[in-house]
A protein has these predicted regions:
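Carbohydrate-binding surfaces of carbohydrate-active enzymes
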Residues: 3-202
Length: 202
């Protein structure tokens, strides 16, 4: 997940330094239901990149927020790219958790240190028996989404005004605005698990 690369403006005047919040949630809600019992993020941006439209530093606290979004969405692990910023090469200006001297923490690296300290406290308070409250479970929604359909609709648009992802996100964002638990599912799932099912442009 590379959320700060100049490809979106986010929300507010500094939103371009945090990314679009629904992209995080949608990814969690999609992959949590697609890859089995364990999912996580293999590459999370720890600082500025070198290949974006423009390459700002993430807003202070953004890396920490992204990590917590992954865990809150059911993820079990977060890896980042990269550990150390290289001294030369094509990604010389791509930040890591450690700066080029091999010792100094980058701003994102400092946030990772803080996260690991906080995780130890959270783990101590974790209750394995806790379940989703009934009031929330009653709002559980299945949102049908299929990558093959997505690619087909994007490849052969009926009009240049059509964009599949923003259309799907209109529904997703509305559901999230009233705190509905959403599972992004395929047609192979058991629909009986969901009181509500939405199939935007399916």
């Amino acid at each position: 997940r590379y959320l700060v690369t100049g490809h979106n403006q986010g929300i507010g005047s500094q939103g371009f330094r945090m990314g679009i919040p629904e992209d995080l949630g949608f990814s969690n809600d999609q992959f949590r239901n697609r890859v089995g019992k364990t999912f996580g993020v293999m590459e999370l941006q720890p600082g500025q990149v070198n290949w974006g439209v423009y390459n700002p530093q993430p807003l202070p606290g953004a890396v920490r927020m992204w990590v917590y979004h992954v865990f809150a969405g059911g993820g079990k692990f977060v890896c980042n790219y990269r550990f150390r910023q290289p001294l030369k090469g094509s990604e010389q200006y791509h930040y890591g958790m450690i700066m080029t001297d091999g010792v100094t923490l980058s701003p994102g690296g400092e946030e990772y240190v803080r996260i690991t300290q906080e995780m130890k406290k959270l783990r101590a308070a974790y209750d394995k028996k806790s379940r989703m409250p009934k009031q929330l479970a009653s709002r559980r929604i299945g949102l049908l989404f299929d990558m093959n359909n997505y690619w087909e609709m994007e490849f052969q648009r009926q009009t240049d005004q059509w964009r599949t992802r923003p259309h799907i996100h209109k529904y997703y964002n509305l559901l999230k605005s009233f705190a509905a638990p959403v599972d992004v599912i395929s047609e192979k799932e058991d629909f009986s698990d969901y009181p509500f099912l939405i199939a935007p442009a399916y």
